[in-house]
Each structure stands twice: as C-alpha cells, then as structure tokens.
C-alpha cells in the first residue's frame, strides 16, 4: 500500500478528557479492561444485529472476545470479530469525544424494534469514544487495527494519548478489531493471566459474548460464564440455580430466606434478582453500612456501590440490571442520575412489600421471627434514618414484651392496650434479662400494662424518631407514668402511703445537683427507689450511651423516685423526722437506683463501703431480731 501515514490532532475536548480519565475519572485502574471488553462485546452484538438484514455480515461460529497478554513484548491485546471500524469510524470514534456511533445505532435499533420486536435488540454497552480512553491508565501507547464488516480495507489508529494520533493502512484477515496496549512499567499485573481472569469474572462474567484469555503457551481458557441468570424467565430457573447464584453474590453458605425475582416494565425498565439471607453474616453488619446490591447495565457489572437499597436493607444481596442507564464518562457517578434514583425507590418498595407480606403470614410467624432475630437491629435503623419510610417499616418490627411470652408487633400491642391507656410504653436496656427484672416495670406489671422490652444497640435512638404509631405516642417508662394514675393495681389494698415531706426535702438537699428532683411514686412495688427523667429529653438509656461516647448530656439531671410503702424508705423518713443527717444514705440510695438501671455508682468505692457497712450491721443483729 502506498498511502502515507496521516497525523491528526485530537479535538480540543479529547485532550482534556484524556487527562481526566487517566488521573481523576476512574477509582480503580482495572476498569480499563471492563471498558475495552464492553466495547468488544458491543461491536460483536452490532455485527450480529446488522447480519439480520445482511447475511454477508454473519458472525463466525467461534466469535468471541480474546484477551492475549505478551510479557516479552509487554503488550496486552484485546481482539473481537465484531462490526469493526472504517478509517472514518476510527477518526470519528477515537479522535473526537462522544462519537462512538452508539447514538446513531440506537436510532436504527429503535426502528428495528418497532418492526421486529424486542427479541432483535442487541446489548449495547456505553459510548466507545469515552471508555476507550481508559486504556491510557495502563498503557503508554495504544494501537487499534480494525476492518469494517463488508469492507476489504483495514486501518490502524495509534496514539500515545498526548495530543495527536496517526492513521495508516493495515491488513486484517477478517472483520473485527485488535486493540494493542503497550503497557506502562507499573502495569505488569495486567500481563498475568490469573489477574486478567479475575478482572473479567468480576466485571463481565454475565456478558453473553464469550470471553477467552490466551496464556503464554497459546492455550485459551474461557473467562466468563456468559449467562445472566436474572435475564431468564423464572419458570426456567430451578431452586438449586437460585441457591447457587445467591451463594455467588453473597459469599455465604446458607440458603436464601426469601428470593425476589421480577421484571419492571413501563416508563422504567429493569430486572431485579434479590435475596434475603437465612443467617447472619460472620462479620458484623456495622463494619460496612452500605448496600452491596450489584448494578448491571445490559448484563455488564458496573458497581456494587450504587447504593441501590438504603443502609437499613444492607443485608439484602443480589443484582439489578437495566437498559435505561447510559454508560458515559463517569460510571462511578451514576448515583446522581434521576433514572437510578427511580430504580432505588422501586427496588426498596419491592423489598418492603415482600417483608410486609411475610410479616403478616401468621402460618409462618416463626420463620419471620427468625428473620427478625437475624436482621431486626438493621431494619430498625430505617426508623431513625428514613423519614419517608418510617410508617412502612414500623409494622415490620418485632419486640419482646413484659406480658407476652414470645415476640409481638406494634399493631398487636395497640390491639391489646387498656381503654384508659394513652401511650405505647417501652423500656431500653442492654439485655432482655435485665429488662425483665427492672424496677422500672413494677408499677406497670401491677396494673397489667404491657411494656415493650428493647435491648438492641439501636433501640435508644429510633422510638423518639418514630414518635407515634396509629396515633399512640411511644413513651419510655423512664420518662414518667401519666397513665398509671388512671389505672389501679390489681388487688390493691386501701393502705394509704405515709407523708414523706421531711425525707423528700432532706434528700433533695443532700443530692443536689446530681438529681433535679426527689418525689414519691406509686409505680414501685418491691423496690425502694428508681430513676426517671422529666419526659422532655432523652430517656435514661440514651443518656447513658451519650456519656459512654464521651459526649455528655446537657439536659437536666434525673429524678429520684422513692417508694413510700417500702420499709427502707419508712425507716429513713423516721430518722429524717428525728433530725438525723442522711447525706451518706442519700448518696447510697442514688447509687442503688443507678445500679438497678444497669449504670455504675458515682463512686464505686464509696458505694461498696456503704453496702459492706449495711451488711455488717445486719450480721451484728441477734438471730431472729427484727
């Protein structure tokens, strides 16, 4: 061939783009291979599509994407038998930005779909003229030799990515494209077959076009499965296939508790295949609070960081695949597109509806309770974080209760409320056994008022955010007992509580500023004292958490409530009326109340000495004495 080499300057926008792609756009260098493989698969699909009306363009039977590393030459070659490019195509697609031909092809695709239906649609991945430039992240120089299907001419495009490119005639036996990357010194890993295999399986395992890797001995190994399970009709998928795929995406060994497989059609089209595990993961779910549902576009894996589900559904695994997202410059920035936001809402609604349906299935209540034991704490985070979804999440929650032996729900609690009861009561502590034995429950038990027992790490946060359920306010039992005055204890005697004005005044004086008030209460039965809050700020458990986190608490000090019918309180009242100094005893009472609530004494040593002194006094009494 006598034609001379042609040198061209990149369009002004390409120079800027190259710098952006190489230095800023992609967060992971391995994405270059995803882009080039996607382009090769795109070209193969385009040739298959055009062959529908031109048999001369038919793909060879062994059509595939071939990846061939050469350590000696320090090159990596990606070859395909796709539609190929002419000289003009190379100049337009690789010399100017956003001229991949995909846009024009999409128009032809729309026309063909109107004529022949959806089954004739090939899968197009991205805009070739953008993703291609990612090759310069790992290559000092890139050459592209291509022959357009239906043409005898081949051309080579070459560039070092620094402002210009060359075009010259070439030879290629069959239509298709060879992209040769002359690798940078720090990109040796991409000349290793095992590394290439890992990248292909990660990003392109489900692309329909076969992908092979040729090793140093010339042996080719398949690198992708080429089957997108979620794209198959549900009727063609066995339970074992679902299980196998679940274990692949979740890296778990259990079976899915729930499988959601659906196709959304209409203004927004996507396919979802999601799984709810039947077991907790081995690693705590607090370590990474983001959803890891995988986003695919036309089978190509894009990212598992698109946050397709909110954090409070991060236990769900699976895939969402759509044809409605463009793959342009910034695949890492897909999160901000309106289409993806709509997909997020639709997928979240689907998962909530599935959980709601299962939560209402009384025949399988134990199965749902097991799910909630595994993932309930995560689900509760949604009440705190997701204002829009709170009303939908609340009925999904399950609780231990002071009156029910098993689990109960908010709707069931409301249905059992006493006519005079105004609020949904709850108590928060670090474990269920401490809750069951809490002095805070005595008055409620005596009146048979049910209290929800909350012991998860998030339980101190979400009730205040929910506020109310079915117009019933949620109220911590440590924040007052408004309803108890309207409810008499069952079997209550007519014994009147003694007046304790002198003792109350003495305790207030002795305990300032550690308590904001001292008052008698009718919500204690067996215990002498209990702590409460004013009802205007965080409950006691939240205050403890804030202190443990070193954040302190700027609100008022707790209220010390005393039981006027308890022998210890009556004895202290007599001593107060006799004029004794009760400062030490007052401190011990406050520490006793703190210990009852799972907190530590203000001064553990002083508290231990007070208890030892009390025990010594008891031991000194003669046997049988009062």
Curated annotation (Swiss-Prot):
Transmembrane segments: none annotated. Residues 545-626 are annotated as: C. CDD domains: HATPase_Hsp90-like. Molecular chaperone. Has ATPase activity. SUPFAM superfamilies: ATPase domain of HSP90 chaperone/DNA topoisomerase II/histidine kinase (SSF55874), HSP90 C-terminal domain (SSF110942), Ribosomal protein S5 domain 2-like (SSF54211). HAMAP family: HSP90 (MF_00505). Residues 332-544 are annotated as: B. Belongs to the heat shock protein 90 family. It is found in: Cytoplasm. Keywords: ATP-binding, Chaperone, Cytoplasm, Nucleotide-binding, Stress response. GO terms for cellular component: cytoplasm. Residues 1-331 are annotated as: A. The keyword Transcription does not apply. The lineage of its organism: Bacteria, Pseudomonadati, Pseudomonadota, Alphaproteobacteria, Hyphomicrobiales. InterPro entries: HATPase_C_sf (IPR036890), Heat_shock_protein_90_CS (IPR019805), HSP90_C (IPR037196), Hsp90_fam (IPR001404), Hsp90_N (IPR020575), Ribosomal_Su5_D2-typ_SF (IPR020568). This is Chaperone protein HtpG. It comes from Methylorubrum extorquens (strain CM4 / NCIMB 13688). Gene3D superfamilies: 3.30.230.80, 3.40.50.11260, Heat shock protein 90, C-terminal domain, Histidine kinase-like ATPase, C-terminal domain. One of its GO terms (molecular function) is ATP-dependent protein folding chaperone. Homodimer.
